[in-house]
């Protein structure tokens, strides 16, 4: 899996450790937004659970991708 822009914008060290763990466990990763602005980063795991990171907010976990879409 290739992850782009994980250090941009700069993140606190503890959040970088969490993101490294997410990247190691995820089966899919993508960013939502434009070239100028990232709205969210999404990690999908083998059990279909999902983690979502939005700029300036804590990473949130969801049981399924549908939980994200309708949350």
Curated annotation (Swiss-Prot):
Q: What else is known?
A: The strain Nijmegen sequence is shown.
Q: What is this protein called?
A: 7.9 kDa protein
């Amino acid at each position: 899996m290739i992850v782009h822009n994980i250090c941009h914008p700069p993140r606190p060290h503890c959040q970088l450790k969490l993101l490294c763990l997410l990247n190691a466990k995820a089966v899919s990763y993508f960013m939502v937004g434009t070239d100028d602005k990232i709205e969210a980063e999404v990690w999908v795991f083998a059990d279909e659970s999902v983690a979502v990171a939005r700029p300036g907010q804590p990473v949130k976990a969801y049981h399924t991708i549908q939980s994200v879409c309708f949350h």
